[in-house]
Amino acid sequence: MAMQLRLIQLEMYLPYVSSNSELLRALSPLKRYCKEQHNIALTIEDFDATDRGEFSLVVIGNNKRNVEQESEHLLTWIETKITGQTLASNISWL
């Protein structure tokens, strides 16, 4: 059975983020959410610019449609739970 992997790369406007610790604090709800999921991996890029944050997620599963639905759910979750706005995104199958 083939594994399906979907890479989601996001750059977000995150107000009041001006250091690595503030970036981690702004994304802490996402870190907690991903920790509770068995099929999602998260990596946060080091702080680079004021009010900006970049991170990548990998959604893993056996069924391509389920991975796609989980990815869409994850993006909706980020949009509603993280204070900020998506500036750029790149979503691809691995």
Mark where each language-model region is:
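Short, charge-patterned binding micro-sites
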Residues: 44-61
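C-terminal structural segments of small proteins and small subunits
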Residues: 60-94
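Short amphipathic alpha-helix segments
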Residues: 21-39
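Ordered, soluble secondary-structure elements with a strong preference for glycine-centered loop motifs
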Residues: 17-25, 68-69
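A structural signal for short, well-ordered beta-strand segments
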Residues: 8-12, 55-57, 89
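Short glycine-/aliphatic-rich beta-strand segments at the starts of folded cytosolic domains
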Residues: 4-16, 20
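Short beta-strand elements
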Residues: 38-46, 85-92
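Short, flexible turn/loop "capping" segments at secondary-structure junctions
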Residues: 1-7, 48-52
